Regions:
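A short secondary-structure junction signal
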Residues: 87-88, 114, 153-154
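N-terminal non-globular leader segments, chiefly Sec-dependent signal peptides
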Residues: 1, 93-112
């Protein structure tokens, strides 16, 4: 069976924004104050608490521009936070809605047609494993079922390479 991990936005992307960098549209992030649930941070994968400042910006979780490189608004704590590390466990922010879109992408970062499905939260790990068990799927996105905003990525857990011991 395919083992999976839930992957947050890379720390290098978050640090660039925390340090005054620009978003995917070459704009500075906007700062707003959270009014409570509904502002999931894509770096720590936790909801941003009411009263905390957050950054809103355009994000493109793909390595290059191409027709399938969806770009959309996401949130990030304004103050640096630790990147989500319990990758084998479904992140807390994915328990705040009844369902999400789960969709597979190929090695060349294109949507694999027929894989996108509005998926109940309890079924996300199983559907992610099912998709990643296919040879044509390189990774999976979890996106908002209401607004299509990127939430996190699901990757296969790769087996460690056996080190030569010299024995």
């Amino acid at each position: 069976m395919t083992a999976i991990r839930f992957v947050a936005m890379p720390t290098t992307d978050a640090e660039r924004l925390w340090n005054g960098g620009r978003d995917a549209y070459d704009r500075l992030p906007e700062t707003i104050v959270s009014d409570g649930p509904g502002h999931p941070c894509r770096h720590c994968l936790q909801n941003i608490d009411a009263g905390q400042e957050l950054l809103v910006f355009a994000y493109r979780p793909f390595p290059e521009l191409q027709p399938y490189a969806e770009t959309g608004p996401i949130f990030l704590h304004k103050q640096p936070c630790a990147r989500y590390a319990a990758e084998e466990i479904m992140p807390p922010m994915l328990t705040t809605s009844r369902d999400f879109i789960v969709r597979g992408y190929s090695e060349n970062d294109r949507i694999v047609y027929g894989t996108g499905a509005v998926t109940e939260i309890g079924d996300i790990p199983a559907y992610g494993k099912e998709l990643l068990g296919r040879s044509d799927i390189a990774y999976v996105h979890v996106r908002s079922a209401r607004n299509n905003c990127f939430q996190c990525r699901i990757d296969k857990v790769k087996a460690p390479v056996l080190a030569e011991t010299g024995a």
